[in-house]
């Protein structure tokens, strides 16, 4: 952040982009942030602050999967014409610190299927980072048919597999300490792949990341 600001980049934390702005030719000319200090009845309060208009020669939309503004731009310019419908998944991720004896820097593991049933798309990842840190996660396609399926519970079941839990379990007899979970999170991802990828440039801007659908789900 400091390097970016040193180069003249302005960062507005806490201000979400709420509206796409267009010029007289219909090209994107920027975005407007949402109004602040609006009551639950929709009326301005004493702390009301009007949103800002941010203009640019080129606006890059990077909101993540099915971004609020990105989907509007896709519809306005017909960017997904002739493409397969986009599909989505939910990815759940945890960051662990594990015993050095179980740490293998640079190791990357991927799996598909288990513990999901044959009708449900999904898979896992496990990456060994620096400083005895491990990132482990599980993705479940959001088109699953079983209404009782819990992606979180499936992730926890995945970690019970002998080849996975070995990294996190302790072994007192060998002086190996159990791992410690440091943080966790979840987010939606695009999973449609190349055939669902819309045109990503349009007058005045571009889509990147999951706003476009760049994730390689394979």
List the predicted regions and their residue ranges.
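Predominantly flavin-linked oxidoreductase catalytic cores and closely associated redox partners
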Residues: 3-173, 213-214
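Flavin (FAD/FMN) cofactor-binding core of flavoprotein oxidoreductases
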Residues: 166-195
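FAD-binding beta-loop-beta segment adjacent to the flavin cofactor pocket
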Residues: 184-215
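An active-site-proximal "capping" alpha-helix that borders the catalytic cofactor pocket
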Residues: 218
């Amino acid at each position: 952040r400091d390097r970016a600001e040193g180069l003249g980049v302005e960062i507005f934390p806490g201000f979400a982009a709420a509206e796409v702005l267009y010029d007289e030719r219909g090209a994107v000319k920027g975005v407007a942030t949402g109004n602040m200090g609006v009551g639950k009845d929709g009326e301005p309060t004493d702390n009301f602050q009007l949103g800002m208009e941010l203009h640019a020669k080129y606006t890059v939309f990077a909101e993540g999967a099915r971004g609020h503004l990105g989907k509007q731009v896709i519809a306005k310019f017909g960017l997904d014409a002739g493409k397969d419908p986009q599909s989505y998944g939910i990815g759940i991720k945890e960051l662990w610190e594990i015993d050095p004896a179980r740490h293998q820097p640079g190791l990357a593991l991927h799996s598909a299927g288990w513990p999901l049933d044959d009708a449900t798309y999904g898979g896992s990842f496990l990456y060994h980072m620096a400083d005895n840190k491990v990132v482990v996660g599980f993705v479940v396609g959001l088109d699953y048919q079983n209404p009782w399926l819990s992606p979180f519970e499936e992730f926890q079941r995945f970690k019970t597999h002998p080849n996975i839990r070995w990294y996190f379990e302790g072994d007192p007899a060998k002086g190996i300490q159990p791992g410690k979970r440091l943080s966790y999170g979840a987010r939606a991802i695009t999973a449609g792949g190349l055939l669902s990828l819309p045109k990503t440039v349009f007058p005045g801007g571009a889509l990147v990341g999951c706003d476009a659908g760049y994730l390689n789900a394979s």
